[in-house]
């Protein structure tokens, strides 16, 4: 073999690529040794509970009352259809319930690819664009959504587009929206690796929801790259695969803390499903089932006190 070929083969070795990734502050690959995360929420907690897909005040109240009956606390309630689908009165009522039960309320930005006039997103190929926004007009409308929610007392917002996230972070820094606004990046943005998560963190994400089927070793690598909380689905609606990950939750907590455990999704048919009050109570039961797994297999795990920050 010529010296030239030897040099080429040496140059393209995987160890060098892994070393380069580590030199720029990223893990060199997925962390199969599953290291325990020492990172925590500010209160010292490793995990918090989140219930997604609560689209209005009726289901929200039913959920929180059912949780009281079970004696279980949660920390975050998330609406996914969009602020533009709620009246001012409905938003104000949800803010009222969030204060009464001391949970963080997260409302979704309404404008997205699936509600735009574009035909592309309805096609097999176009679906790959996810919920991302098309055109600057949609960015402006997205900012208006967040401003409206903020005026009504909302501070947590679910974001689907990286450009909108960046613009909102600039708005937050410049005082155009309240400085205490919290931006949660949706799993529908399609991120599933440490480098992507790092980008989201640098442009303003306060918590990141990776793709739903991310594996434990991938999750460990993501945690090594970022400090913000990671939001993880413990179960999923049929439209997202329908898989249940309850027995993986102890490992979620151990390798990825601080984490929000998104629970109750298996009750829904799809992402923007209108959960009924009866189904909201079923979601409360799912929280109890996940808590049982944690208490059995990782009893030393520390849950955050019931706070909203």
What is the meaning of each model-derived region?
Residues 2-154, 159-191, 209, 216-309:
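Active-site pocket-lining/capping segments in soluble small-molecule metabolic enzymes
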Residues 192-196:
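Short, glycine/polar-rich helix-capping loops at beta-to-alpha or helix-loop-helix junctions
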Residues 198-201:
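Acidic/histidine-rich catalytic cores of soluble enzymes
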Residues 203-206:
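Hydrophobic, aromatic-enriched interface-forming segments
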């Amino acid at each position: 073999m010529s010296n030239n070929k030897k040099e080429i083969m040496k140059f393209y070795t995987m160890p060098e690529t892994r070393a380069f990734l580590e030199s720029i502050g990223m893990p060199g690959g997925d962390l199969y040794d599953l290291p325990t995360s020492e990172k925590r929420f500010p209160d010292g907690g490793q995990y918090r509970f989140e219930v997604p897909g609560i689209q209005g005040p009726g289901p929200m109240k039913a959920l929180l009352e059912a949780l009281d009956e079970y004696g279980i606390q949660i920390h975050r309630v998330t609406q996914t259809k969009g602020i533009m689908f709620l009246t001012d009165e409905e938003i104000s009522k949800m803010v009222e319930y969030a204060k009464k039960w001391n949970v963080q309320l997260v409302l979704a930005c309404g404008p997205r690819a699936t509600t735009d006039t574009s035909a592309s997103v309805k096609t097999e190929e176009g679906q790959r664009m996810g919920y991302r926004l098309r055109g600057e007009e949609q960015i402006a409308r997205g900012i208006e959504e967040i401003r409206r929610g903020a005026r009504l007392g909302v501070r947590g917002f679910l974001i689907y587009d990286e450009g909108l996230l960046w613009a909102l972070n600039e708005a937050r820094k410049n005082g155009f929206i309240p400085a205490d606004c919290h931006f949660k990046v949706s799993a529908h943005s399609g991120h599933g690796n440490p480098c992507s998560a790092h980008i989201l963190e640098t442009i303003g994400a306060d918590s990141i929801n990776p793709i739903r089927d991310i594996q434990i070793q991938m999750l460990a690598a993501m945690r090594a790259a970022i400090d913000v909380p990671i939001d993880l689905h413990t179960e999923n609606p049929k439209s997202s695969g329908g898989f249940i990950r309850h027995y993986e939750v102890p490992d979620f907590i151990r390798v990825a803390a601080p984490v929000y455990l998104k629970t109750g999704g298996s009750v829904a048919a799809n992402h923007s499903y209108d959960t009924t009050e009866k189904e909201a109570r079923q979601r409360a039961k799912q929280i109890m089932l996940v808590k049982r797994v944690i208490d059995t297999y990782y009893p030393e795990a520390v849950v955050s006190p019931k706070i909203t920050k």
